[in-house]
Swiss-Prot record:
The protein, known as: GMP reductase
Keyword Oxidoreductase part of the UniProt annotation: yes
A Pfam family that the UniProt record links to this protein: IMPDH
Organism: Escherichia coli O139:H28 (strain E24377A / ETEC)
GO CC terms of this entry: cytosol; GMP reductase complex
Entry-linked HAMAP family: GMP_reduct_type1
Binding positions for K(+) per the UniProt entry: G181, G183
Lineage: Bacteria, Pseudomonadati, Pseudomonadota, Gammaproteobacteria, Enterobacterales
Description of how the protein assembles with itself and partners: Homotetramer.
Its job: Catalyzes the irreversible NADPH-dependent deamination of GMP to IMP. It functions in the conversion of nucleobase, nucleoside and nucleotide derivatives of G to A nucleotides, and in maintaining the intracellular balance of A and G nucleotides.
Keywords, sorted A to Z: Metal-binding, NADP, Oxidoreductase, Potassium
CDD domains attached to this UniProt entry: IMPDH (cd00381)
């Protein structure tokens, strides 16, 4: 046993220090990034935000809606090959280039993903997702996927420390997904005691990945557009959002009505709700590590997308970054004990 004494920080522990700027307007900020990925060699340009691969977020409808904002969607793994074919038949190449195909690590997952990728060459992203990216089996699966799909851009996770981030990149991942336990409907930290404050995880993993020519996506922990800005400021190349994009018309959750008001169910992918839906229930050897919440219906996702992108542009103007790429270079975090004046929050 050992104890690390240095303090680890989450998004709520810091603010971004403002700096002198020559920008005249938020409209002067360029949010689009251009990337060429280490292993696939693929080039991509767009806004580096990703809708999470949850079945109450990462839907085909979400992908179609967010593509118009140049935002990616990691489409959840529970669609059938036939459903994928129907989506592809009704989608433009511009939509498909903003889609990630999500997969688990079983043999069945691998075969199904292979069939999906064979449907259309415009599907260039694979998102290999497990709760615990520290297993040897997961590393071997990433290497297997890289060998099978040498020209596909592979995103793999989740991990929270530099050494494992490096291991996944060396095994074939172009992008490493960073985050254990910070999600709004994730209970891993309270069920297991395992986790890592998200901002510190992003900073550590970004440093490790960039040293090898890889990239990271900060997955989880964002509750506001300001948190998204902090993730980019900490060095994330991409930011993945779940809860912030849940509860919309495109989110895919089950709608219920109580006292004349409509709500949408949103749950973690290791929750009892998810396991009942997809595998028949919680196996007797494990515990559910997610929760289910009721969200008031929030309308179309385009309004939320505009709010997030507007907040990002504003953050860039506060530190003098004319491009999103410059945000991390212009970011100085200050540790704080308060984030906002909450006097009217309950009104």
């Amino acid at each position: 046993m050992r104890i690390e004494e240095d303090l680890k920080l989450g998004f709520k522990d810091v603010l971004i220090r403002p700096k002198r700027s020559t920008l005249k307007s938020r409209s002067d900020v360029e949010l689009e990034r251009q990337f060429t990925f280490k292993h696939s060699g693929q080039s991509w340009s767009g806004v580096p935000i990703i809708a999470a691969n949850m079945d109450t977020v990462g839907t085909f409808s979400m992908a179609s809606a967010l593509a118009s904002f140049d935002i990616l969607t990691a489409v959840h793994k529970h669609y059938s090959v036939e459903e994928w074919q129907a989506f592809i038949n009704n989608s433009s190449a511009d939509v498909l280039k903003h889609v990630m195909v999500s997969t688990g690590t079983s043999d069945a997952d691998f075969e199904k993903t292979k069939q999906i990728l064979d449907l259309n060459p415009a599907l260039n992203f694979v998102c290999i997702d497990v709760a615990n990216g520290y297993s040897e089996h997961f590393v071997q699966f990433v290497a297997k996927a890289r060998e099978a799909w040498p020209t596909k851009t592979i995103c793999a996770g989740n991990v929270v420390t530099g050494e494992m981030c490096e291991e996944l990149i060396l095994s074939g991942a172009d992008i490493v997904k960073v985050g254990i336990g910070p999600g709004s409907v994730c209970t891993t930290r309270v069920k297991t005691g395992v986790g890592y404050p998200q901002l510190s995880a992003v900073i550590e993993c970004a440093d490790a990945a960039h040293g090898l020519g890889g990239m990271i996506v900060s997955d989880g922990g964002c509750t506001t557009p300001g948190d998204v800005a902090k993730a980019f400021g900490g060095g994330a190349d991409f930011v993945m959002l779940g809860g912030m994009l849940a509860g919309h018309e495109e989110s895919g959750g089950r709608i219920i009505e109580e006292n004349g008001e409509k709500f949408m169910l949103f749950y973690g992918m290791s929750s009892e709700s998810a396991m009942k839906r997809h595998v028949g229930g919680v196996a007797e050897y494990r515990a559910a590590e997610g929760k289910t919440v009721k969200l008031p219906l929030r309308g179309p996702v385009e309004n939320t997308a505009r709010d997030i992108l507007g907040g990002l542009r504003s953050a860039c103007t506060y530190v003098g970054a004319s491009r999103l790429k410059e945000l991390t270079k212009r970011t100085t975090f200050i540790r704080v004990q308060e984030q906002e004046n909450r006097i009217f929050n309950n009104l």
